[in-house]
Amino acid sequence: MKLIVSVMPRSLEEAQALDDTRYLDADIIEWRADYLPKEAILQVAPAIFEKFAGRELVFTLRTRSEGGEIDLSPEEYIHLIKEVAQLYQPDYIDFEYYSYKDVFEEMLDFPNLVLSYHNFQETPENMMEILSELTILNPKLVKVAVMAHTEQDVLDLMNYTRGFKTLNPEQEYVTISMGKVGKVSRITADVTGSSWSFASLDEVSAPGQISLASMKKIREILDEA
């Protein structure tokens, strides 16, 4: 289980002021570029990629329809992703498949996609169909984050993930039940078949996130013989 921490600068000055040494315990850095105005993203990108040079990095534009901070037309979304991908070659590129399905074909040349689905309202009843459709597309990683309201919501997603991972052992997954009741899903990734778990440093990027320090301790305990 790799631990992912998001950086969410709201300006070039904030990006330049990031202390990269505080993120040494994170296995992967996620740059949530949606906290910037869309016209500032390409201006801030050099500072982010220089700051975290040599680290695994996920480039994410989380749009408002999936719980993020930015609204983008399909043309704007694809343009920004392609520009960052071609200029900086991030290790992973998050792509909101269900929000931008109509332009997905333009991303087929990119082998490092994280095909993602986020639902901040509920754990939908068609989770198996969602996981199946994303798996068939054979991305670098399938990511699903949904809001849990009951313990059963959490257990259902865990069972679906374990089942899909068993049937598709070469495919990487990260599935998250958001909210307080879903916190357990963040610490059982290895059991359910998730490759990543998201943790927070100063500011959470999703409901129910656990601090990086706590997640590191939990991982150490789980790794004990």
Curated annotation (Swiss-Prot):
InterPro entries: Aldolase_TIM, DHquinase_I, Type-I_3-dehydroquinase. GO terms for biological process: 3,4-dihydroxybenzoate biosynthetic process; amino acid biosynthetic process; aromatic amino acid family biosynthetic process; chorismate biosynthetic process. The active site is at residues 118, 143. It catalyses: 3-dehydroquinate = 3-dehydroshikimate + H2O. Gene3D superfamilies: Aldolase class I. Disulfide bonds: none annotated. Pfam families: DHquinase_I. Pathway: Metabolic intermediate biosynthesis; chorismate biosynthesis; chorismate from D-erythrose 4-phosphate and phosphoenolpyruvate: step 3/7. SUPFAM superfamilies: Aldolase (SSF51569). One of its GO terms (molecular function) is 3-dehydroquinate dehydratase activity. Its EC number is 4.2.1.10. Keywords: Amino-acid biosynthesis, Aromatic amino acid biosynthesis, Lyase, Schiff base. 3-dehydroquinate binds at residues 6, 30-32, 62, 186, 205, 209. HAMAP family: AroD. Homodimer. Involved in the third step of the chorismate pathway, which leads to the biosynthesis of aromatic amino acids. Catalyzes the cis-dehydration of 3-dehydroquinate (DHQ) and introduces the first double bond of the aromatic ring to yield 3-dehydroshikimate. Belongs to the type-I 3-dehydroquinase family. This is 3-dehydroquinate dehydratase. The lineage of its organism: Bacteria, Bacillati, Bacillota, Bacilli, Lactobacillales.
